[in-house]
């Protein structure tokens, strides 16, 4: 089987393929000189479809797709992801592209903070107006990269349930198809607030949330400060980051076959956005965060760059392949559950997103 990797950068998209996860061939840049914050290898149909959320400094953001593994690309005239007339906003970037739980369903998280849903495979999208008009919106802030919904988690069996997260605002969930949304942040710390206000109802700087489809009630979150687990779909959260060298980071990834196995890539902190001691290490837990082990064989020392929230991902092989892209343009891959690594690309622009699929 062929493994496809998409690497979105600040200056275009690169597409790689490998038959053995050892030797890789890349093409690109696709969408040259456009920021690609989001990408997706959608393998649900008979023909795999690649999606890229690209932003041009001249023409703005556009969703593009390819049905021939990146050889040619198509787009919707005038943009598939647009605010309706009267919304008083324009899409600046597409931060997230996620397949939904139904046929042809695709979700997009954007900047400014909004979520859009397509039911026709990405040809058109509708704004989740219940979220856009949420009374908390006026108090949501912007993270260092802007205000955006960077996490969209469809429920694997309930199409009316959707969990989302933004920076800065926190985790929200709908159970009625988007008509209403409730904050789900109890137990998540907000270090930037005064001590007596550090556990608010909403407003946390959540960096990424993930879950395994076989355990939809269990969520894992990487916060601006803190790594957390929820066993009740975000109703309450428990810290699981005490054994890590730092609880600051961006990505958090769950194993495709073992729902208690997760990976994080700790950074030194908000003011030191490279790994502790500049040693690139992936930390893995095999017991849902109760304990952690670091792995770094093949990864560099003197690594003074970070890994963004969507720049680490996992494939569906067993053992699983783990992939990460760094802000110095290097891309790294592991074919043994993250234990040993090799570099598969170098000297690309600043990497914003890495996604894989097996076709």
Predicted features along the sequence, with ranges:
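Extracellular glycan-interacting surfaces
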Residues: 1-359
């Amino acid at each position: 089987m062929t493994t496809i990797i998409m690497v979105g950068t600040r200056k275009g998209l690169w597409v790689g393929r490998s038959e053995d996860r050892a030797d890789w061939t890349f093409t690109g840049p696709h969408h040259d000189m456009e920021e690609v914050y989001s990408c997706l290898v959608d393998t649900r149909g008979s023909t795999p479809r690649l999606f890229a959320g690209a932003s041009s400094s001249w023409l703005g953001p556009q969703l593009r797709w390819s049905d021939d593994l990146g050889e040619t690309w198509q787009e919707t005239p005038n943009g598939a992801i647009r605010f309706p007339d009267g919304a008083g906003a324009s899409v600046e970037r597409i931060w997230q592209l996620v397949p939904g739980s139904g046929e042809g369903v695709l979700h997009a998280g954007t900047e400014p903070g909004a979520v859009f849903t397509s039911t026709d495979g990405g040809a058109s999208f509708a704004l989740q107006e219940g979220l856009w008009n949420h009374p908390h919106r006026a108090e949501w802030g912007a993270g260092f990269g802007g205000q955006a919904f960077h996490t969209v988690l469809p429920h694997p069996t309930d199409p009316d349930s959707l969990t989302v997260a933004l920076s800065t605002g926190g985790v929200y969930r709908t159970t009625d198809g988007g008509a209403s949304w409730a904050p789900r942040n109890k137990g998540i710390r907000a270090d930037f607030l005064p001590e007596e206000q550090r556990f608010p109802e909403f407003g946390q700087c959540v960096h990424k949330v993930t879950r395994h489809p076989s355990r939809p009630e269990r969520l894992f979150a990487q916060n601006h400060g803190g790594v957390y687990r929820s066993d009740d779909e975000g109703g309450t959260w428990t810290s699981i980051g005490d054994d890590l060298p730092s609880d600051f980071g961006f990505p958090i990834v769950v194993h495709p076959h073992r729902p208690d196995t997760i990976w994080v890539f700790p950074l030194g902190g908000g003011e030191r956005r490279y790994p502790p001691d500049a040693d690139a290490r992936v930390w893995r837990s095999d017991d849902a965060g109760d304990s952690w082990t670091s792995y770094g064989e093949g990864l560099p020392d003197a690594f003074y760059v970070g890994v963004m929230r969507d720049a680490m991902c996992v494939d569906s092989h067993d053992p699983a392949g783990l992939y990460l892209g760094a802000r110095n343009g290097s891309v790294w891959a592991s074919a043994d559950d993250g234990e040993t690594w090799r570099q598969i690309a170098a000297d690309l622009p600043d990497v914003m997103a890495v996604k894989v699929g097996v076709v």
